[in-house]
Regions:
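Terminal-appendage/accessory-domain detector
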Residues: 1-75, 176-186, 193-429
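Extended, well-ordered alpha-helical scaffold segments
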Residues: 3, 30, 98-110, 150-158, ...
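Secretory-pathway/luminal and periplasmic proteins that interact with or process carbohydrate-rich
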Residues: 18, 36-38, 110-118, 162-170, ...
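Hydrophobic alpha-helical hairpins/lids featuring a short glycine-rich hinge
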Residues: 61-116
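Active-site nucleophile and cofactor-binding loops and adjacent substrate-binding regions
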Residues: 74-80, 99-104, 122-134, 179-183, ...
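Well-ordered alpha-helical segments within folded domains of soluble proteins
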Residues: 80-87, 133-140, 186-190, 249-251
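Active-site cavity-forming subdomains of large catalytic enzyme subunits
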Residues: 93-99, 116-125, 138-155, 166-178, ...
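Acidic helix/loop microenvironments that form the catalytic cleft of cell-wall polysaccharide enzymes
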Residues: 156-164, 274-277
């Protein structure tokens, strides 16, 4: 249960971090007619909404800042679709935090298992968080509603027919990408509600000849879906982001951090930075000299250079003054990315990078980062997770409220979801 509390804390951080962004403000404007009703809290406004609208908005907003958690083996962000949906449902029903946490565990388990067996081919064209996220939301909401097995099957199979999210949304500076988990949250929640009312689904939706697997994966391994079921929970094996950008940048950033800690490296003395990574790094994190925060978050050259110049790759690295930093700009031209076959072969189970920093005096410092800091095999401590949460939330809701939320979640003090939501809903805008 502690792992679920960590996930819920981290989701709150990502949600609040995205709440005062331009994208969130535009989304609130678009949903103006659906606000001021219902019982559910919405990030970015003090107005309430009905469950479906809250699920969509919070699912979107919690993905905007790129700080949400990851299930590495499935190239999937479970928190945004899963928690956003079941949180709205729990708040509308005045449910307990304990019940919410249990539902989260179920939603994470179902969706992460599906995400794992459809990779790596699924990720070539599809945003797993949008596609598989519908199952996380549907499973969590089905549990919270107390649906029986047949009803839960109907919910999952109905949700799966609405799975969507294309990788092309990553390839340009648009606001579409974060709406993928928002849509997944709304779809999954709606599927559970209609299943409760008796709407039936297609039982063989996953493995059918024209089903989810056939359409969205070259080699779905459904025979592996139930491997080790009951031995552990996948929510215990979640990656929590240590940097505020696309996770494909992380191995290189972490490798650079290792080298900076061990060697006297100054940016003005660097001749070249050579990065060996897996294919998704070059395909997704492709921007050089980014002009916007979005592009910067999907730029390997920028994030690596920002780590050297600024010391961290958190929110401040994506502000206007950082994007205009001439030292970062100059250093980007020294970053060379190549596809490393060893790193490619390990993807998606391991996200790795090989970094060499060559100095102007000819010395070369090298490090092979086998995993990301924050991955299950190198997890963030509770204190590191808390530090991240405080950094993201304190400027927006104040130090006192941030402290109370973290203490309630990590200290097992939170009881009612509505009471928990009150701590941020009137301040995250």
């Amino acid at each position: 249960m502690h792992h679920a509390r960590r996930a819920l804390l981290d989701w709150h951080g990502a949600l609040i971090a995205g709440s005062n962004t331009d994208a969130a403000n535009r989304l609130i404007q678009a949903y103006a007619e659906e606000l001021g009703v219902g019982k559910c809290s919405v990030a970015g406004t003090s107005q309430k909404a009905f469950t479906r609208a809250a699920a969509f908005i919070n699912g979107t907003v919690s993905h905007i800042s790129e700080f949400d958690d990851i299930f590495r083996d499935g190239a999937y962000h479970p928190a945004c679709p899963t928690i956003s949906a079941v949180y709205a449902l729990a708040e509308s029903r005045d449910d307990s935090v304990e019940h919410l946490l249990a539902a989260m565990i179920v939603g994470y388990e179902v969706s992460t298992r599906i995400s794992k067996v459809i990779q790596p081919s699924h990720y070539e064209f599809f945003h797993t968080t949008g596609t598989v996220g519908v199952f996380g939301a549907a499973a969590a909401c089905s549990y919270l509603l107390g649906l029986n097995a047949a009803q839960a099957c109907d919910a999952l199979s109905t949700a799966g027919t609405f799975a969507s999210g294309l990788q092309q949304a990553f390839r340009s500076d648009s606001m579409t990408k974060p709406m993928h988990p928002g849509h997944a949250a709304e779809v999954g929640l709606n599927a559970a509600l209609v299943a409760q009312a008796g709407m039936t689904g297609t039982p063989d939706l996953l493995e059918g000849d024209a089903g989810f697997g056939a359409a969205l994966s070259k080699n779905p391994r459904w025979n592996e879906l139930f491997e080790d079921l009951g031995k552990s929970w996948n929510i215990e094996h979640i990656t929590f982001k240590n940097h505020g950008c696309c996770g494909h940048n992380f191995p290189a950033i972490d490798a650079v951090s290792h080298l900076l800690n061990d060697h006297p490296i100054r940016s003005e003395n660097i001749a070249q930075i050579r990065v060996g990574g897996y294919r998704a790094t070059s395909e997704v994190c492709k921007y050089v000299h980014p002009k916007t925060a979005f592009e910067a978050k999907f730029s390997l050259t920028y994030t690596v250079s920002a780590r050297i110049v600024l010391g961290r790759v958190r929110e401040k690295a994506f502000l206007a003054d950082a994007l205009a930093n001439l030292e970062i700009y100059a250093l980007e031209d020294k970053v060379v990315l190549r596809i490393d076959q060893e790193c490619t072969n390990k993807f998606p189970i391991h996200r790795s990078a090989k970094v060499e920093i060559e100095m102007k005096d000819g010395s070369v410092y090298a490090h092979h980062q086998h995993t990301r800091h924050g991955d299950p095999d190198e997890p963030l401590t509770d204190q590191e997770l808390l530090d991240k949460f405080i950094e993201l939330t304190e400027p927006r809701i104040g130090a006192q409220q941030a402290k109370i939320i973290s203490e309630q979640l990590l200290g097992n003090q939170a009881h009612a979801v509505r009471d928990l939501a009150k701590l941020w809903s009137n301040r995250s805008h």
